[in-house]
Amino acid sequence: MILLHFVYSLWALLLIPLINAEEFTPKVTKTIAQDSFEILSFDDSNTLIRKQDASVTISFDDGETWEKVEGIEDEITWIYIDPFNRHDRAVATSMYESRLYITNDQGKSWERITLPDSEKNISSRGCYIETHPLNKNYFLAKCNYCEKTEVDNEENSGDEEGAPVIFNITRCTDKVFASNDGGKSFSEIKSSLERNENSAISISDCGFAKTGKDSDLESSDTSIICLFQNMQLIMDEFSSPYTESKLVLTTDWGKSLKEFDQFKDKVVNGYRILKSHMVVITQGDRYNDMSSMDVWVSNDLSNFKMAYMPTQLRHSMQGEIYEDAMGRIILPMSRERSDQEEDKGIVSEILISDSQGLKFSPIPWTANEVFGYINLYQPTYLKGTMIASLYPLSRRRNRKGKAKGVKNKGVTKISVDNGLTWTVLKVVDPDNADSFDCDITDFENCSLQNMFYTREGSTPTAGILMTTGIVGDGSVFDWGDQRTFISRDGGLTWKLAFDFPCLYAVGDYGNVIVAIPYNADEDDDPQSEFYYSLDQGKTWTEYQLETTIYPNEVMNTTPDGSGAKFILNGFTLAHMDGTTNFIYAIDFSTAFNDKTCEENDFEDWNLAEGKCVNGVKYKIRRRKQDAQCLVKKVFEDLQLFETACDKCTEADYECAFEFVRDATGKCVPDYNLIVLSDVCDKTKKKTVPVKPLQLVKGDKCKKPMTVKSVDISCEGVPKKGTNDKEIVVTENKFDFKIQFYQYFDTVTDESLLMINSRGEAYISHDGGQTIRRFDSNGETIIEVVFNPYYNSSAYLFGSKGSIFSTHDRGYSFMTAKLPEARQLGMPLDFNAKAQDTFIYYGGKNCESILSPECHAVAYLTNDGGETFTEMLDNAIHCEFAGSLFKYPSNEDMVMCQVKEKSSQTRSLVSSTDFFQDDKNTVFENIIGYLSTGGYIIVAVPHENNELRAYVTIDGTEFAEAKFPYDEDVGKQEAFTILESEKGSIFLHLATNLVPGRDFGNLLKSNSNGTSFVTLEHAVNRNTFGYVDFEKIQGLEGIILTNIVSNSDKVAENKEDKQLKTKITFNEGSDWNFLKPPKRDSEGKKFSCSSKSLDECSLHLHGYTERKDIRDTYSSGSALGMMFGVGNVGPNLLPYKECSTFFTTDGGETWAEVKKTPHQWEYGDHGGILVLVPENSETDSISYSTDFGKTWKDYKFCADKVLVKDITTVPRDSALRFLLFGEAADIGGSSFRTYTIDFRNIFERQCDFDITGKESADYKYSPLSSKSNCLFGHQTEFLRKTDENCFIGNIPLSEFSRNIKNCSCTRQDFECDYNFYKANDGTCKLVKGLSPANAADVCKKEPDLIEYFESSGYRKIPLSTCEGGLKLDAPSSPHACPGKEKEFKEKYSVSAGPFAFIFISILLIIFFAAWFVYDRGIRRNGGFARFGEIRLGDDGLIENNNTDRVVNNIVKSGFYVFSNIGSLLQHTKTNIAHVISKIRGRFGNRTGPSYSSLIHDQFLDEADDLLAGHDEDANDLSSFMDQGSNFEIEEDDVPTLEEEHTSYTDQPTTTDVPDALPEGNEENIDRPDSTAPSNENQ
């Protein structure tokens, strides 16, 4: 009985706590408040504070009751706890001026701190106090001031306290004040940068060098680091603000400032002070805030070393940089600025340094082809643990109604050994295995994915973690499908807690957990509830709330996680003016009948499964999961026990600086890192021994392992102190060939797309330094199209009907399905003004491409390819014409070339509603059409296999293009549109089409593209229609062409082509051969020495021979510079026999720089020039930093490679180049890329005045030594003068100035239509022709009433000359037919007004004469007294002033007439006397003698026409890079009875755009040259 009673009692003792636990309900207290969103806890206390509206409230009982604080008089903007004095100090910032409130006793009392008054015209936008970790009295107050904006209402002037203030945020200043007496007094740390009138924002950012009580930095307690910056709002030419900066150190509270010498000539973008390091980030280009950045690291605030970065750092997030327990620097970075607003500011990559902080590398498994957002979480209390998530940026969109494609896979992984090894987050939950869509035992394909691990789980626990996420393979992530999971082993394994996402918090070191669903309806109950667990998440209990709230935060009231009291803050939208907050205080402190755990309730939990981490084994004592007690060690931190490991292993080591880990994890030498280090500077030997491993800094393992040295080759490694030492090379090896590449043309970064021989796409955002494979979901990429109007957009076509589009340079892609039609390989056509609008061409009824029913269909999309609509059947090429013209007749106009299935002809149709209701046939039969520079040109077949061209500048009015009737021009069978610029079209008209013997004439149009004149004859052309024609980029009117010098014999098939190179400096009006250099690159004279350029000149290989048509002679950013491969002699030699030549003055003078053919590339606007041998293996490049004066060789790789191409960004403004090469390896060849970075070889960035004024580094100067006029003006260009600085992102080519406009000379004119340039330089009419009918202009412009005859000359459109020769002076005006009346009215005068004026004048003269006669002559005796009157006579009647005036007139008249009469008489007498003498002396001579002088203008000989040319010019483009060949069969040609319409070259009044996308060449070709001739009359 006694035994039974004992068993019963024992059972009761065990059961009662369980019953109490099941019946336990936490104490919940509710408080209702307005607009309260953040609650703060004082550490190790029961005191909480929060901001409510504009006041501060406080609770001294863990949130159960609240009261308004006393002592704060102002409205408060925000409050915060002092991070170094979390137990008792908080700060509240005032809304008014420079005032703050501070408490040092947990909010019981508050002291007002007033900062020094600001200037009268500015006002504070808020202040923030930073405190010192070691001295409680040290303050740094940071304030922001902005100029006040004028307001009309005096009541709102902001002068009175409480009045609203309007700030001008474009004129703001930061100020920093320091105090060493607890805020009683402050002194300003004044910026050492002078703020000028252009500085919009002035930034001062100061911080104590000590950032924690455990700081390892060598600094004093009073050391303060300050960064001062001035930012200027830049004019339109720039893409970003200009920044100047100074980084300084002060130890005397700002009285003296010491600038860091290493950053004097750099732009410091930001800095971060960590426990062991100070990190400084410098901006590579002060004129581009998106430029790449460098990271500098110091551990003594004195010596900084530049860290090695595996990729470009462009958008750092300095505020997120931190240091882990090993002293490694964690550097989050955003590598892009997405076009998608929601993507901005999100971390896209995380780099981790070695323990020295000098070599960064990405998290290994994130450096793959999937690019996305990265999130890294390191719980500080779990040493060595890292949880990282990668969320792919690829966005996939599909046609409505179609199944979704597979997304790029995201992944979440965990490491418990500081990132040495990683595993997925395993879900070990057999009870819920059926609730998941995948097999949770297949960890690699079914694991927990958490895209953003929140900091809510940062409360210290013994390995107990919670998170939200979904279980799967990472291919699908829908935020609405998230669930809540829990782990008890530090994150290695997880189990399901809730089927919905929750906010959560832990207490009592993880023994109490509170979770609240984001959505109250998750349990089909509209009322909110929270759940709690007292057994570390094993079981959960629901607590119902009476109100529906949106949870804002749930938190433990003790930040160290030791307490068992929580705060739940939620809100409802109760009224329009704000929110109503419900604050719940939840108390679990009496759980388990208030029992405290005893020793046997605890167990040991080992971190990292008991393995050594950083040379130490860690363990934590934690409560057993089912123990019926709470730890109740409130305000005590969680204890972590450690035991040093005896032996060091490879896990305790990292690769030395000169080594990197290969695919197997072994540390191998890296040539680039060897160059950056100094290991080879210490030896003269070819090799040096270096240990590949180094012990991790701070590792605590006891016995180091033996590390054997590895011999590193120092052959070719530059020595310290040389510029070559600073060149950085990155090599990438591939087992395939790159067949296509193209850069995105932006300054944001150096992004490019590459396609390999397997049809796989690769993307790089750092100029090829790091390359990622694009996941096309198994589809081969068969075509890539870049949007020519939107530089960040490109489209990739998949082999299975997908289209992958990017609008952010390849950072993210959207996938859509193309219409269910056969891909025909036709390019997309884009709308120039709508990024998401384009036309795709697919084949319909095309089971076979040869099927008779197979035809093309144009599909239109307005949403970037998400949906397509069928626009037009049988369309093979369309243009959004309305978006191309400057003044379109209709902005929605679309033109399409249509080829009907049943017809062999093609027609041109247009529509203004995408062919829904409107369809207009423009031409019934065409060969093809193209758009260029604001024109659309249509090729129309004519009789006898000829072509005619029609041009429009508005899409409605078409005019026939009239070609000149030169004697050597037969049929118009083929022509190539070369380019259009400055209102003219350049066109090549083929005159000989025999394959291999092609050539023709170079023509130029008037402003509306309808009247052409011949510029040069026998210009070289190839069979594909490409022409040796190139306009020099960035300069006005300079063109290079190759002519066939023996064209007559070539046409007769007697000789092969002999090419010569010619150049023009006035847009084709005059041509000369290239002047050869006197000596070659070795200082020797050229064998060809004739003074005649016709016999000895420089010749260059041109456009028709290029492997890549993007490799132009010149660069638009390197003004005046050109490279070319050629020779000096009578004719052009084969390519292999040529040398490489260079010019800096636009082609006036040349120099040989290499004896063999080389490839070239421009960088930094010509500030860095690079050459690499062509068609021969090499391991070196040549580069120049002084505009080609001197050249240096640099070895960029260990073994020789055959360089296929060298390239850089399209604007040639970068300092980074990309080489594509192929090298022979064992077992075959490998394709390689080399990224060569020259950023560090320059001492500094050139100092540039953003207003375009001259500075110490930039001066205005003419392009060449000559200063004569070109295009009617003298121009100077802003050019760099110092070779030791780099230019950067300055549009230098846009800064030029015209010194003056010159008088017009012969060089400012070209021949008009039907005129040609004769040998004497004059323009003469073509024999047998008449000038164009000038009256035709009246037909084209009905409003005209007059026209003028042509003089034979027309002024070059680019010329701005004034005065001087007027060779284009018009004739007298002629009346337009039918406008004779208007013409007569314009130039004739009406008889009525003329008669009135004439009679009026006669009447006035008659009256005056009668008055003088009556008062002065008749009254004084009449004409009879004329002979008696003498000057001064007193006999005249003078009764008043009128009489005296009249008498004076009479006397003066008499005097004048008397003298004239005497003079005539005397002259008559003398002449008679002389004649008499002559007759007497020469009486035998008969008849007169005559001479005549005809005065006329004359012109210089042709050789003198170019004398004195100034090479200054401005902004021309290269010609187009894509040919469109249009062929016509015999059946295509209809018989046309109409003859040519009459024509005039007078331009229309319509303005025409003068811009043309560079790099395009269009060819309209009629290959049939055997048809009979049809002479045009």
UniProtKB/Swiss-Prot annotation:
Functions as a sorting receptor in the Golgi compartment required for the intracellular sorting and delivery of soluble vacuolar proteins, like carboxypeptidase Y (CPY) and proteinase A. Executes multiple rounds of sorting by cycling between the late Golgi and a prevacuolar endosome-like compartment. Binds the Golgi-modified P2 form of CPY, and this interaction is dependent on the presence of an intact CPY vacuolar protein sorting signal. The chain crosses the membrane at residues 1392-1412. Keywords: Glycoprotein, Golgi apparatus, Membrane, Protein transport, Receptor, Repeat, Signal, Transmembrane, Transmembrane helix, Transport. It comes from the Eukaryota. InterPro entries: Sialidase_sf (IPR036278), Sortilin_C (IPR031777), Sortilin_N (IPR031778), VPS10 (IPR006581), VPS10-sortilin (IPR050310), WD40/YVTN_repeat-like_dom_sf (IPR015943). GO terms for cellular component: cytosol; Golgi apparatus; membrane. It comes from Saccharomyces cerevisiae (strain RM11-1a) (Baker's yeast). Belongs to the VPS10-related sortilin family. Residues 1531-1577 are annotated as: Disordered. Residues 22-1391 are lumenal. Residues 1-21 form the signal peptide. Residues 1413-1577 are cytoplasmic. It is a single-pass type I membrane protein. Glycans are attached at residues 121, 168, 445, 791, 1008, 1301. Pfam families: Sortilin-Vps10, Sortilin_C. Its main location: Golgi. GO terms for biological process: Golgi to endosome transport; Golgi to vacuole transport; protein targeting to vacuole. BNR repeats lie at residues 58-68, 101-111, 179-187, 414-423, 485-495, 531-541, 762-771, 859-869, 1141-1150, 1183-1192. This is Vacuolar protein sorting/targeting protein PEP1. It is found in: Golgi apparatus, trans-Golgi network membrane; Prevacuolar compartment membrane.
